[in-house]
Amino acid sequence: SKMYGNYPNKWSNDLSNEEISRYTINALMRMRFCKEDGELEFEHKLNVDQNPKNYEAWFLHSNRLMADEKIFFGHWSSLKDINSKNIYPLDHGCVWGDRLTAYDLENHNYISQKSLEIS
């Protein structure tokens, strides 16, 4: 499908409607690392300390909008125990045998359940 692909990997006001849709899907579902200029990188899925050269995790980006807002997100199961202000990763690899995680907004803490083994 034309909806999937690695390009465009950088926003431009000159993108076609199809390219805008593809970029948006990639930014919301696949973005993990980006360059200072906003270029997205899709190959690496490891933890933030294993970032590709010249790329940073999107939530550590120096120009990140809404830095003072709490951001809860998933779809990055290799991300472990991030200690970054207002950043709350919720995907802790349940499907890979780790744990299912939620965040208690009232008490401000994570709640986790170890993945069950099904035979």
Where are these regions (language model features)?
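Feature recognizes metal-dependent phosphohydrolase scaffolds
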Residues: S1-S119
